[in-house]
Structures are given as C-alpha cells and as structure tokens.
Amino acid sequence: MQGELLVQGSKNTALPVLAATLLGKGVFVLHHCPKISDVEHMLEMLEVAGCTVGREGHMLLIDTRQADQYCVTGNGAGKMRSTITLLGSILGRMHRVEIPYPGGCTIGKRPIDLHLRGLEQLGAVFEHCEHTLKGQAEQLHGANIYLDFPSVGAT
C-alpha cells in the first residue's frame, strides 16, 4: 500500500483510517491526528493487535508489519463505537477476529447489523458470545452490498 492522505483532524476521519492501516504491512504516517481519548483507545487496540505506535505532536507512526493478534481487547476496546471499524481490517489480514461489542454511544442504541451483514456477504461468519463478537473469514470475496438506508459508518 502506498500513497498520501490528508487527515482532517477529526476523530470520525482518523479512527477508520487508523483501523485501515491493518490492511497493509508497513509503516504508515498520519498527520493532523487529534489527540483525544477515542484515538488513544484505537492506538491501544492497534498495539494489542501487534502494531508499534509512535506519536510526535499530531503526527502518528503506525508500524503494522508485526501485527498478528486477532483478539483485540484492551482498556478502550468496548468503550467506543468505532471498535467496529476493526472488524473488516482484522478479518482481511488475519482471517479471524474477536472484539468486545462496541459501546460508548450516548445517542442511543445503534445496532451493528449493517456491518455484520456486509461482511457476511463478503464471506465472513460470526458467532455472538456474551461479551464478545467472534468472526472467521477463510476466503473473503467481492460482493455488491446494498444498505437498507445510508450509513457513513457501515460504508
């Protein structure tokens, strides 16, 4: 993977980009990344997955070359909604995933069924456990996925 991306400095931009770094094996540099708790929790989960993370001001360095842990827990794992963005990246790289159910939403109940249904159409299989979501995808494949309604997060 190669290229440049100007990150806007918002958590809603930074968190999916951080999760996407797991799709490649290399060192990724992200500029203008906000220093807020959700970003720090995501960095902790990337470290649990085996990444090396460094920060210089608002610049992040993510080294994903050694990432090999599919079970992503940690202090922030179940505390924020964006944990769900790790599902596809970890499945794509490691072919299995285990994460706590996402939390942290004060808006109200926000189901994750669109995320799961989309990944199932790509070949993933999920098992719902009491506190965690487990998934496997031996061979992911392309698919046309149609959402019941527009969803920025599910996209």
For each feature predicted by the language model, list its residue ranges.
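Structural preference for solvent-exposed beta-strand-turn elements
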Residues: 1-155
